[in-house]
Amino acid sequence: MESFLPLVDENLRSALWFRPEMALTFGTLVLFVLDLVFRRSQARVALLTAGALAVLAAAAGLLAIQPPDAQALFNGMLANDAFAIFFKWLFLAAGALTVIIAAQGRDFPPERIGQFFALLMAIVLGMFMMASATDLLMVYLSLELVSMVSYVLAGFRKGDRKATEGSLKYVIYGGVASGVMLFGMSYLYGLTGTTSLHELGAQLQALQAGSAVSVAATRVALVVAIVFVTAGIGYKVAAVPWHMWCPDVYEGAPTPFTAFLSVGPKAAGFALAIRIFHSALAGPSSPVTGFAESLAGIPWPAVVGVIAAVTMTLGNLTALGQTNLKRLLAYSSIAHAGYTLMGLSAVSDRGMQSVMIYMLVYLVMNVGAFLVVILVAESTGSESILDYRGLSKRHPSAAVAFAIFLFSLTGLPPFAGFVGKWYLFYAVFERIDGPGGAWYAWLALIGALNTAIALYYYVRVIRAMFIDAPYVAEAPPVRLRVGYQVMLGAFSVAILVFGIWWTPMVRWTEASLQLFRG
């Protein structure tokens, strides 16, 4: 009994700092109940939207009073630190924007909007725990929570063949990736005897410092474990070669959820990758970066760099031939995962900060781009690039906003996307004078060439909007709801402001580099 009491005390203490997650859990259940109670109410959409935003606001309010010091929760299963809090704010913003967009659009019938909001809260909860996970068990459980609910929402359109096909592919690829990652985790546990990410790092260092025989005996198992865990994370961020689910899911899913999927789970995947690669898979550290340069004889930063180069190249080259804008943005999202992996491959504080800055900027410009896709699709009933011809004449403000988003996605100044991409390249440039500098120089060159490729297919859309004549003689006008107009204006202003004045982003991310180290 006496040995049990400290566990109870620890859980009660942890619960005080687990309140944002508790608010999301309770809110998810309440939204399901409200959906049943107000099933026949004329104001059900407004009530459920207010309920979903209230849940997110409650979580935000509780998150705002979190302590700044890093600490372990629930006996080391989770960590409460500035790094996790940064990503949680990002997830709340993505969730709130998705709720507002979905409430105004036509993708969800009124009788099903409550289910969507409740399931969306569940995904946000899972992403919260992904950002805080410091134990392999919690890593897997949080990843599965996000994945399982995402499968449902990807196929949320009843009777839609593309939605069903995309959801099925998502389930198949997700199930395989989940099993592969779990298999890799089992190897890590077998090698070290622990599931704690921080203890894993210490145990792996001890293994590598052992005799030549013991190191050789464990090297193969360790390599398999690293490859399999990397595959699980690569699936979540849509990196090559684990990206094949992405285009079909993005095209078939309701567009508000596609916008959320392109940012939220991707950011959660990168948060998880940073925790794992800078905690669990940390071998003997470099005096330059303070992080591991190799593990089991493999220079894993270079491996991540290769994945980054292949991901951005394949994503951009495939996007060149797309005629459906959602599929184009899907391949663009794959390419942006490659750019972000550049920061991860730098294995430095600057690299981590560049990932955080880029995810923050990517949230605004990508959700903004999908918002334009929604409003054009509602007017034309199509997502083809042909329907964007002459958009500048049918709705000039929408065309200008979309051009801003696309130029920002390219990474051109003076837009916020340039700042995000600059920090990614800066993190790589810092490594050129150190070990493996030649490889980092090549990675920077590949990234620059891919930016030029991306400019081509983004400009193709811009040309259609401002230069090409409408595809049909009587092109339907594009009508914007007031809410959409406000959001497009806010996104455009944010991209322009942070493209010129990025100091707040840099300071926030610098203050958020405090990871719980065990």
Swiss-Prot record:
One of its GO terms (cellular component) is plasma membrane. GO terms for molecular function: NADH dehydrogenase (ubiquinone) activity; NADH:ubiquinone reductase (non-electrogenic) activity; quinone binding. It holds the Pfam family Proton_antipo_M. It comes from the Bacteria. The chain crosses the membrane at residues 18-38, 45-65, 82-102, 113-133, 136-156, 171-191, 220-240, 254-274, 295-315, 328-348, 355-375, 399-419, 439-459, 486-506. It is a multi-pass membrane protein. Its EC number is 7.1.1.-. InterPro entries: NADH-Q_OxRdtase_suN/2 (IPR010096), ND/Mrp_TM (IPR001750). One of its GO terms (biological process) is ATP synthesis coupled electron transport. It catalyses: a quinone + NADH + 5 H(+)(in) = a quinol + NAD(+) + 4 H(+)(out). Its main location: membrane. Keywords: Cell inner membrane, Cell membrane, Membrane, NAD, Quinone, Translocase, Transmembrane, Transmembrane helix, Transport, Ubiquinone. It is found in: Cell inner membrane. NDH-1 shuttles electrons from NADH, via FMN and iron-sulfur (Fe-S) centers, to quinones in the respiratory chain. The immediate electron acceptor for the enzyme in this species is believed to be ubiquinone. Couples the redox reaction to proton translocation (for every two electrons transferred, four hydrogen ions are translocated across the cytoplasmic membrane), and thus conserves the redox energy in a proton gradient. NDH-1 is composed of 14 different subunits. Subunits NuoA, H, J, K, L, M, N constitute the membrane sector of the complex. Belongs to the complex I subunit 2 family. This is NADH-quinone oxidoreductase subunit N. It comes from Anaeromyxobacter sp. (strain Fw109-5).
